[in-house]
Amino acid sequence: MAIPPDIKDSIAKIKPLSQSAVRLMSVMADPDHTVGQIAAIVESDPILTGNVLRVVNSPAFGLRAKISTVSRAVSYTGGNMVVGLALHLCASGIFNHPLEGYESQRGALWRHCLLTAIASREIARFSSGKTDPEVAYTGGLLHDVGKAIMSGSLGNSAREIVAAADAEKTTDFVAGELAAVGTDHTEVGQAIAKHWSLPDPLLEVIRYHHAPSKAHEKYRPLVYAVHLGDFIAMMGGTGTGADTLLYNLDHDYKKFINVSAGELEKVILDSGQEYQQVVESMFGSEEEQQ
């Protein structure tokens, strides 16, 4: 596939991620990272510092005493939420933009990616390979970033793709995107990730989360974790519009994810509960995002 020139131009115009966000993702990719490393990055960014303190002191955390230091705040929020805050601050224009080409509203992409991130992290704990749950979380946050650009190129094609899928004339929404535009949101997403100089594990997740068997063998367990996390999020009611559940579940995930039916059910339940808590702590209520 070759990305059409107009989409390449749109990608080139995307603002770089903040240094804080890039450094946080790099640190989180190291399984031996410390709270101190995360706190040091947050402290170098006044806006991120303010948001981390706002979140940890929100009613959702229910702490009796106010937290006034970043190190203590990070020990409560955890690194995943800090990464989420950093991405939301520097790329909110992408994650909160209405995906009109997918017939979804403002904030739908962020909500879907957030629940995918939480579910992917939990699924990664059952991985048969050396899959870092923290990297799975970040991959989940970013897996559908390509839709922000693809949306404008789809036009009115979404309904045609849905109709074709219903009539079994196309295999899934990715194939429909390719037929309509000449590329798909996974390829566009990977191009955005390269534009942001993101590390290889995240490039693989973004490119192959709908085709995990095609991922590099080294990253395949990670990609399968996000693949399954994506489906959990869609089943949990946080899809991104017309394409929701119009993708194929690769049942080979069982070769990489050793999770029982009961454990999977618990992941789904726990992920949904954590999602609601994160939304409340970050935004006050889900409606405030919309």
Task: Report the location of each language-model feature.
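Terminal helices and disordered tails flanking the catalytic cores of nucleotide-processing hydrolases
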Residues: 1-6, 251-290
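Conserved alpha-helical "signature site"
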Residues: 1-247, 285-290
